[in-house]
Amino acid sequence: MESIILNLLNLTGEERAAFAVLAPQRFHPDGDGLTVEDWQSAQVILGNPPPECLRGSTALRWLHTRSAGVDPYTAPGVLPSEAALTCSTGAYGHSVSEHLFALLLALMKRLPNYRDQQNRALWRDLGPVKTLLGAQVLVVGTGDLGSSFARLCQTLGARTSGVRRDPA
């Protein structure tokens, strides 16, 4: 019997073709149009289905989420006990840390304030701006994302310290 794979990822045509070479699967970006029977017959799901759609899915053997967090899927009764749950931890650290870094620099240089002034046709000096050179940056979370963010800050001369939830 062929495994039923539901691929909920939002893919390009080229990406779909690459997935299809690996194994036959049904593509339903974000789960649109799937019935209760579709959910309950799936053995593999790639993506982030609504947890309530998985209750009673006794055929499910593997759920891989496109997100790092899986809390909604760990509640009792959401997944069958035999199902493996994997996630995309580590896939987003660099790109998200670049976004955080850009926001940090924008705030340090007061770019939102200057943009607001520009919208009002004002050009007032808002005083000195900060630099990362020699700054002390506290990073909350030392996983993939936090570590990547700390490296970016260090590149511009900041000293970094990190804190995390558990001491491990």
Annotated model-derived regions:
Residues 128-168:
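Rossmann-like dinucleotide/phosphate-binding beta-alpha-beta segment
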Residues 50-51, 66-69, 89-92, 106, ...:
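Short, flexible active-site-adjacent loop segments at beta-strand->alpha-helix junctions, enriched
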Residues 18, 99, 103, 148, ...:
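Rossmann-fold NAD(P)-dependent oxidoreductase module
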Residues 45, 63, 100, 137-141, ...:
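Generic structural signal for small/hydrophobic residues in well-ordered secondary structure
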Residues 13, 94, 147:
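Loop/helix-junction capping segments adjacent to catalytic residues or to phosphate/diphosphate-binding pockets
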Residues 1-86:
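An N-terminal-biased, well-structured beta-alpha scaffold segment characteristic
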Residues 81-136, 162:
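Phosphate-binding beta-alpha-beta segment of Rossmann-like dinucleotide-binding domains, i.e.
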